[in-house]
Curated annotation (Swiss-Prot):
Residues 1-32 are annotated as: Disordered. Residues 16-26 have a biased composition (Pro residues). It comes from Oryza sativa subsp. japonica (Rice). This is Vacuolar iron transporter homolog 3. It is found in: Vacuole membrane.
Amino acid sequence: MAMQMNSVVHVSTSPSPSPATSPPPEGKQEHGEVAAVHVVGVGDDEAVMVVKDEEAFGGGGVDYSGRAQWLRAAVLGANDGLVSVASLMIGVGAVSESGRAMLVSGVAGLVAGACSMAIGEFVSVYAQYDIEVAAARRRRRQRRRRCDGDGEEEGSGRLPSPFKAAAASALAFTVGALLPLLAGGFVRPWAPRVAAVCAATSAALAGFGALGAALGGASPARSAARVLLGGWAAMAACYGVLRLFANLY
């Protein structure tokens, strides 16, 4: 993991002779540019600025924060589809040996889950969209009051797209849900069918966990084991509860 180093620079706020002759903030420069400077406090005589530079100080590495939101949504959607449909098929298989019943239950889980994920993501991201639009309008009004209408307006940042988020979430859920359906939905004997669903789900869970960790800069082995154990627990719980329900009723 790249090491992040911060340095605090005290810069006088008194007028300088000219912008061209004013020295840059003290700190390491790379390719003629100073590291990112963020003002964290302003006093009467000086401003305190925090200089954050991950690459100029030799840290290097890749910044994963920009893709964190979409990566999280994709991994969660695929895992939800995989575990939900696999657990549903195994639970139905616990009370019925019919291959058709398992297949129909899996397809129903795929459709219902994809719609639920898409609607939930749409509502969540649209709420975030409304909040960011309202905050941007407040900033523009405050800026116009400070500058008496003479200052330049802030450009609008990149706002989240509710439709793209909903489509991505539904697609990720569908991809995950198709794996147990294709693995065991068309196998006729009961025992091989359940074994195929469990094997395909286990392999996919480990793969999704390792892939998400690798793209996010974490440990693939630890993430794969964590996701795999969680999937096994969900499938075992679904099988046990439905088996108990079938024996009681």
